[in-house]
Regions:
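Conserved, well-structured ligand/cofactor-binding cores
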Residues: 2-231
Length: 231
């Protein structure tokens, strides 16, 4: 994760243009950028919570999309979704989890509690991707409705914390552990090459017994290795 992305930095609205379409949900009608894949609830959040410019991290969006795909598969097994709906959700969720549609998630980290709006942002983008891929209009909720189908059998209070865990594990596996391995290898190499260098140890502000610089560096290496194993 390279810090929390910003709206300005990603230019998430720059490609949307000035044309609008109308999206409808249980709360009524709202205007959305014509080419945007998000829907009414996401747009309301953009309108009502224009606070700061830090966006929800893409890694969390990708993890939440993975969960949507898995939920669709299970719902299909229990005949709560048709095979067509499962396939449409899984295809869209996979594309999102790969980062293909990162510019369709404009919400700030400053929003109402529990992540409900981000959950709906993912639901709406999946719904509209499915609509577009099957030749239906954006906002038609055909073949999958963002709430009734994409979010079926889920609660934000479960899905969002689960996505946090998934994102943390993926970042750990893909980013942190490989970097720690490189650091451990580098310290191991330095420990070996610096065994002939003698330095004075320190006890607080006083000189202590002599020791090899390689021994000191090997202690750093072992501490990092132990921390890696705990992770």
């Amino acid at each position: 994760m390279k810090g929390i992305p910003t709206i300005k930095g990603l230019g998430r609205h720059s490609a949307m243009g000035g044309q609008l379409r109308q999206e409808h949900d249980s709360m009524g009608c709202v205007e959305v950028p014509a080419e945007a894949l998000w829907g009414a609830q996401t747009q309301r959040s953009c309108n009502n919570f224009a606070i700061g410019n830090q966006l929800i991290p893409a890694e969390l969006i990708h993890a939440l999309a993975r969960i949507k795909g898995c939920c669709a598969e299970i719902n299909g097994r229990h005949e709560l979704l048709t095979a067509q709906q499962v396939q449409a959700i899984e295809r869209a969720a996979a594309a999102i989890s790969e980062g293909t549609h990162d510019n369709q998630f404009p919400l700030s980290v400053w929003q109402t509690g529990s992540g409900t709006q981000t959950n709906m942002n993912v639901n709406e983008v999946i719904s509209n991707l499915a609509a577009r891929d099957t030749g239906h209009a954006l906002g038609s909720h055909n073949p999958v409705h963002p709430n009734d189908h994409v979010n079926r059998s889920q609660s934000t209070n479960d899905a969002f914390p689960a996505a946090i865990h998934v994102a943390a594990v993926l970042l750990l596996q893909n980013d942190l552990l490989p970097e720690l391995d490189r650091l451990i290898a580098s310290l191991d190499e330095k420990a070996g090459s610096w065994m002939d260098i003698i330095k004075i140890g320190r006890t607080h502000l006083q000189d202590a017994v002599p020791l090899r610089l390689g021994d000191e560096v090997s202690a750093w290496r072992d501490q990092i290795h132990q921390g890696r194993e705990w992770l």
